[in-house]
């Protein structure tokens, strides 16, 4: 089984508008409300792929109850740790091919709630094969909280796919317990390394060769419409993707993480992992609903993705 972790979940509310006008009323014909936060997007896609998945993290209040009911309705197993605060809403306004997001920061977690979660997390880690951790840490938790979680995973020799950024990621990379996979984009790489990172192959190779990434088995860099660049131990790969019509890009990175996690879970080859990851990310972008893929289109798109060792 795969364990997904969402420490700062939300209800994602998507408003589709032809035109978004400031300082006036905008009326919405369609509203989509889904359990959100990066880890729950990963969860939904893994479920649609057909993998056994269990969702955990922190939930509280009426919004937390809504998320659990929604997961129950689609048959996704979950075992969250309760908190006293109210889980957040996040709003995405999709307009004229653009996306404007309004993100609530969410509840503040107490020291005791953090401690209880780590004990709960350890009990779940013992039962699963691989762990996928995604998104930001909520207020109140120390910046090295993910490091503590990865130490637990290392203790039980369980692989970890980590998708976070900023100081939380830096703390993990500076620590002794390393994730199996990280998935930064070029902007995040630039911040981590304090150097300009472009999509140029030689620049990416030099960036991924930095000491900061020692001990991380996979570094997969998202390049948007240009595909991806990856380092697996000592091998480098360029991933080229076909042009597609993008309907809703929200959650495509999370769908990519689902593909990475699924491929590791099934012990697939490097090429299969990179193709699966990018294929699921693209399938998500073709759907209105966040964290949703149409598996009927999977095989045809999978075959159009090219992976080249460089």
From Swiss-Prot:
Keyword Ubl conjugation in annotation: no
One GO cellular component term noted in the UniProt record for this chain: cytosol
Pathway terms, separated by semicolons: Carbohydrate metabolism; D-tagatose 6-phosphate degradation; D-glyceraldehyde 3-phosphate and glycerone phosphate from D-tagatose 6-phosphate: step 1/2
UniProt name for this protein: Tagatose-6-phosphate kinase
Recorded GO MF terms: ATP binding; phosphofructokinase activity; tagatose-6-phosphate kinase activity
One Pfam short name: PfkB
Gene: lacC
Entry keyword set: ATP-binding, Kinase, Lactose metabolism, Nucleotide-binding, Transferase
